[in-house]
Amino acid sequence: IVVIYSTAIFFKEACTIDENLTTLDQIHEAAKAEFLQKGYKDASLRNIVKSLGKTLGAFYGYYKSKEELFEALVGEHYQYLIDRFKDAQKQFADLPHEQQPEVMGDISGVCMFDMLHYAYQHLEECKLILCCSEGTRFSGLIDEMVEIEVEGTHAYQRVLAELGRPSPPLDPTMEHILITAMFH
């Protein structure tokens, strides 16, 4: 099955659920397949449980809503990505100002590598966040990271000015466009 979201194409094998899994794990696997195929907004709890030969009652024994299920699938992964990005920003900001220009690429490079490595280790969950989360709080991951980066950029501009190396002022719209493009 080929699933197309935005400009990304993902290949998803037909969903076959291991019957040896617990009911909860079966729900998670079926939900991942449904969300990857249809996105959060168009995914159906009925389809998820029907694909397992279960009832909605079985589902509601574990979760109160589709939103709660999606949170269970991606919440920890979303939090890891945001926390890792914030940690890199803090590591950089905590350096002596004189060192910052010399190591900026090092810290951000390690952060991006770590985040990409994590995303590949948790590929389906990260695809859910980045491509299938419209209608959830997770759909704002890139926007949240852009805002963190904008704040970091402004702090770094102040450091450069303090070091006698001021950077030219940035138009806020252009700054937002450039930083957003960096994440896409």
Model-inferred region functions:
Residues A72, K86-Y118:
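Hydrophobic alpha-helical connector segments
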Residues Q26, A30, E34-E68, A72:
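Helix-turn-helix
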